[in-house]
């Protein structure tokens, strides 16, 4: 039975997402997610000059990784992910396991 490890990585630094996971297995899919951009406008002077403003932006880059693995290798892959130093990034790990039930056994139980 195959198990999929799904990882969503959010970072402010784009080169981080491109170069950090260099040791990924060949059966890994990288999917780019849409970037989000937040723009903040701040008044430079609080008194007279209303037109004098300064803008700051915050861009969040996202990447979606899917690693296909066998069920008995799941622990090894998870510890490999924990050892990866993901400084400057926020990540979410989801495990997806598909099991197959035997139809004959289920009918005998009912």
UniProtKB/Swiss-Prot annotation:
Belongs to the universal ribosomal protein uS10 family. The gene is RPS10. It is found in: Mitochondrion. GO terms for biological process: translation. SMART domains: Ribosomal_S10. GO terms for cellular component: mitochondrion; ribonucleoprotein complex; ribosome. One of its GO terms (molecular function) is structural constituent of ribosome. InterPro entries: Ribosomal_uS10, Ribosomal_uS10_dom, Ribosomal_uS10_dom_sf. Coiled coil: none annotated. Keywords: Mitochondrion, Ribonucleoprotein, Ribosomal protein. It comes from Pisum sativum. This is Small ribosomal subunit protein uS10m. The keyword Lyase does not apply. SUPFAM superfamilies: Ribosomal protein S10. The lineage of its organism: Eukaryota, Viridiplantae, Streptophyta, Embryophyta, Tracheophyta. It comes from the Eukaryota.
């Amino acid at each position: 039975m195959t198990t999929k490890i799904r990882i969503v990585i959010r970072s402010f630094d784009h080169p981080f997402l491109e170069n950090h996971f260099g040791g990924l297995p060949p059966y890994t899919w990288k999917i780019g997610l849409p970037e989000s951009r937040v723009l903040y406008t701040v008044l430079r002077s609080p008194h007279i000059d209303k037109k004098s403003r300064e803008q700051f932006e915050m861009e969040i880059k996202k990447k979606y990784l899917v690693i296909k693995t066998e069920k008995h290798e799941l622990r090894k892959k998870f510890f490999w992910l924990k050892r990866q130093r993901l400084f400057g990034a926020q990540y979410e790990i989801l495990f997806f396991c598909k099991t197959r039930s035997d139809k004959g056994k289920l009918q005998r139980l009912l």
